[in-house]
Amino acid sequence: MKRLMTLLAAAFMVLAVNAQELANFQRVNVVSPEIKDGQVTFRLKADYATVVELYGSWMPGYGDRIPMTRGENFVWEVTVPAPSPEIYTYNFYVDGVSVNDPTNVLVQRDGNRYLSMLLVDGERSENYKEANKRGSVSHVWYDSELLGINRRMTVYTPYGYETSKKTKYPVLYLLHGGGGDEEAWSSMGRAAQILDNLIEKGLAKPMIVVMPNGNPGQQAAQTLNLPVSDVNFRDPANANAYVKSLVTEIIPFVEKNYRAIPKKEARAIAGLSMGGGHTTSATMLFPGVFDYICPMSCGLRDGENVDAQMQAIKKAGYKLYWIGCGTADFAWPGTETMVEILKRNGLEHTLYASDGGHTWYNWRLYLNTFAPLLFK
């Protein structure tokens, strides 16, 4: 009897598993997004929805949405012309509620938002894809006495770093903008993919890329849910605390723990928006540290000490002062002021004026453009 019950139980389990497999087999196979013949089709299975819409970052305004049509098995669908080659983000609105594409595993985090990703292949986006020879990306913790907390940064090491035990590398300190953190450049910016491709093609020198958290009160990205510092960094007494920490704590940490070349000619600094401000501040406060200076989408205030600080940069010497900004960017007037200050003080520089505004569309392009110019 006991054996019979055991056999019946086993048979029941087999039937249950088969039933589950059948249920899985009968589920609707939704493919989204699907790029074909110059068009992109987006699909979402939403059984009880009455209105489903699509919003994509390639659309002109945040209020613009494209209605989707309900088809068989409650799969909503819309086909649109493929935007120009680039990386875009998108999401659906189901009865007014924003949701990501559940069938798309490619996701980017922008601050406190997760967004589905669309990569349209082409010349501009070629270096945003995975390379054949890939470097490593790691999260590294360090102690900051200046900021009073243990903090995290993201570090990229190029392909071959682990095996070339004696080779030393130059370092790019790559800074994010407001609302970002130490993961912004590796997620939204595709920094690792861009460097991997440029290095593999021989267009850029193999380099270490350090991406710190530019929010002085944060230990790390908010995804870790760690408490923030209670120090008021808006207090003038704490002015430039993060920039000072970058130069006096992060750089020594990197040069001690990585095979980094500890010389001015092997250090570059670049940043977007808030990070662009950190870039100019770091080079004006510490003019003898970096040979390559690349602020993006930011401005520079003209004040009584600016000329003296610019003259100090000129005296210390540098190899590249590269500025990138979109002509439709709200930071463009500030960029024009920066250029005027550099001209007034006789500092050679390059202005890369692109179209577009204050977006990753431009910042990825800028990294892809200036990285080959570093450490030459």
Segments the model singles out, each with a brief description of its role:
Residues 2-8:
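Sec-dependent signal peptide recognition
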Residues 8-9, 157:
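A periodicity- and composition-biased signal for non-globular, repetitive helical segments
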Residues 10-18:
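Hydrophobic h-region of N-terminal signal peptides that target proteins for export
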Residues 21-22, 32-65, 69-376:
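Non-catalytic cap/lid and distal C-terminal segments of serine-dependent acyl enzymes
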Residues 25-27:
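Short, solvent-exposed loop/edge segments of extracellular or virion-exposed proteins
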